[in-house]
């Protein structure tokens, strides 16, 4: 009897008789295959086998559930090919001859083959234990380390109907979804000892070290034979043959050398060689912690990374507390140098982190951490999910970077990719065991046609283990403070949000196109993260506006802390393609405030997406080629530059002021970084004969010109100082996290927007020529007001048309539906922020006048 949980099929564990029969059949298959010889080391011994307790099945498969080895043996999609025929995506070219050339591969005599297989069979039937027992043995030390952290049990999932009564019309779908989540939690509790233990797969799979040796385990149910190869055994496939259990888990134990040293030296290259339905292939272990690409070599090599205890990086600084208002500096280590080169973790730590701190941000979000073979993918075509990118340095270098950020009081968010994976077959997960349905959906459902990548099967038990463990690994091992989950919209819908326009109709969110398995995974990972690390921050990239996306899981939501408010950046690009006269201020305010009540958003005017080649930064949209010749302060600016500098400041401030509860800026855009991002690339020859021109491998536009923002003789410096003033204004007044927000004026004729946020009053005049004297604005608090931020101040590249020391006194009488008002001067293309002050208010807030910088900066 087989039962399912949202596409996850659970077979009953096979009996001993079934096991022996399966093993006999497996051995007979290998005998008939005339396979490669895998001889056992004389000193090899088994440390006990483990079950892949719940094997992987495609949630869209209609076949009966059996053991993973029975289901996947010989399975291959019509579209798949042998390892030698696979072509790596974009910059990685498969060459099996090159890869296999350094391994001694021979066909064997029947007697030798039989002897080897008999030894393998004996190992496969001895001492089997479950993961639950393994984790129980480790629980004492782990509980000491994590301080007895517990993941709370599921709630009833009903509170979402009180939060959003419109969800009642979709109660069947939402109750079903929460029911699948609860059942999955129960199955994990029953079979794995709980979500906390389930998420420690990296302590079972991959390479694990004990006092007596190294154990290597790999889930590869489609493989017919496997061997561990590497520098340590001269890439001899006969030396270290792996044994398999009935759940597709391959294992080998390598005892320490006679002198007590590990059998695999730290820094050695390693791979797993498998005889698969697609042929013989060498793969990087799926749980590898470090991989490198030697110069001139394709593909990457896995590296056994286990430095001596005295050489391992020891964290010195505690994690900072979760900031009240989240202000994120989005960054990419490789392109963070002012020079045209790939930068390092160490240089980013020493040069960029202090800059981020000085600018006033309290969080740094780092892209492209997970290893990716194709640099120009911006880190989104991940090949090795547990390995930090070796382009930038070692794992210990990354730890040092994060530790330094913590010392500076910065939380560190990782841009994590669980929405898809690279199509690379030799250094990635694709076709890992020779089948296309191991980690991913089989057939066309497993391919993202726009991203040219593979799509995970979130209904697979082992995929859940892999991804949940991956999220925890980065929190535990590297002490990241949270994540920005990439491509969540693609995960939550089977159409992946492609060629679909979300209108806000709830039927778009809760129907047949919703991937319930994926949503349940997101609920699991958010429960895991928040249970183990209550201070962690989790941001989801969702463009659809999924209701209850940022509602706690126990209440029936998906569980994110923040949603990226992606529509705002698109709106700015749309407006920048028009004349100022065609802008509608009501359209601007609607887009900025069009978000779900009670669900926090991180807003941005532009991120890395808008800066990529083929698009333009906001600064380049505004000033175009004039940025090359007219940014020196001692040279007369063109009208285009004057307009660009003014609107650049206004766009960023109103985005922060109205758009969300958190703010994000991509590195360099704080000072209006010119041009675009173009990663080094060569010509691409497409199958249809077309050629996509490259840039001759140039790094010229794959860097950040921080020197421009620092140069006081350039107008970029004023833009950078304004951005710093914005951050300090929020740090002082906390307006982004205030529940009070009221737009009192959006005048299409005057092009004026006035709104209250927290205790501040914002006045924006978007008119291109009209300045308004004695312009009355409404306010809710009577008394005296002062200017606390003025975009027209000369320090920010403005014209100093306002007296920032002036005081403004309110008069009674309703205006713009406010109980009182006062008169201001509103120059064209300016943004001014006012704050109510007491007569005896001589605290630090008064010192912020007139520019919003910290007192020591004035």
From Swiss-Prot:
It comes from Arabidopsis thaliana. Coiled coil: none annotated. GO terms for molecular function: 1,4-alpha-glucan branching enzyme activity; cation binding; hydrolase activity, hydrolyzing O-glycosyl compounds. Monomer. Mostly expressed in roots, stems, seeds, inflorescences, flowers and leaves, and, to a lower extent, in seedlings. One of its GO terms (biological process) is amylopectin biosynthetic process. Induction: Induced by light, preferentially when associated with glucose, fructose or sucrose treatment, but repressed by darkness. This is 1,4-alpha-glucan-branching enzyme 2-1, chloroplastic/amyloplastic. Belongs to the glycosyl hydrolase 13 family. GlgB subfamily. Catalyzes the formation of the alpha-1,6-glucosidic linkages in starch by scission of a 1,4-alpha-linked oligosaccharide from growing alpha-1,4-glucan chains and the subsequent attachment of the oligosaccharide to the alpha-1,6 position. Pathway: Glycan biosynthesis; starch biosynthesis. Disruption phenotype: Modified starch composition. This phenotype is enhanced when associated with SBE2.2 and SBE3 disruptions. Residues 38-125, 139-158 are annotated as: Disordered. Residues 139-148 have a biased composition (Basic and acidic residues). It is found in: Plastid, Chloroplast stroma; Plastid, Amyloplast. Residues 58-69, 77-91 have a biased composition (Low complexity). Its EC number is 2.4.1.18.
